[in-house]
Amino acid sequence: MITNYSEGNSLSTIPVEKNDDILSMEEILEISGLDMMQGILDGIYPPAPISKLLNYNVHAVEKGKVVFRGEPNLASRNPMGTLHGGWYGTILDSAMACAVMTTLPKGKIQTTLEFKVNIIRPIPADVEVDAIGTVEHAGRSTGVAVGRIVDVASGKLYASASTTCIIMTPKLK
């Protein structure tokens, strides 16, 4: 729970998740990355807990492209009342890494090696945005993607980003 200490009022309550609310590594390795992301979109598989925390969801999926739609909440604001830079980074990392995931066959996973975010302008309160991740390269050992955050209503660009992901074949015990 996030609390306003000066007032003693609760700003929002973040539910505590159980491990049952995410796919196991065994389950992930049995499906392609595209099937996993499509399953999350369709409600067959659970979304990543971070998306609930930061108020965004998978909105569209195709091979090499994923769109997350969200609206930053009050808990995502910094002490000055503007949107914390970590929100931009998190939703863009999700969109770009998941776009790379859509290119992977079953038995493969990926994770972010590095990413860079360029915040162009602040996202105002009560604005719904799309974070669009698009793959530029999907190789055997790395994937490269770019991302952007745009206003759903106007198309205004708020941020752009790029990432490199490592592609792995995990060995289960």
Question: Model segments located where?
Answer:
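Terminal targeting signals and extreme-terminal segments of soluble enzymes
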Residues: 1-173
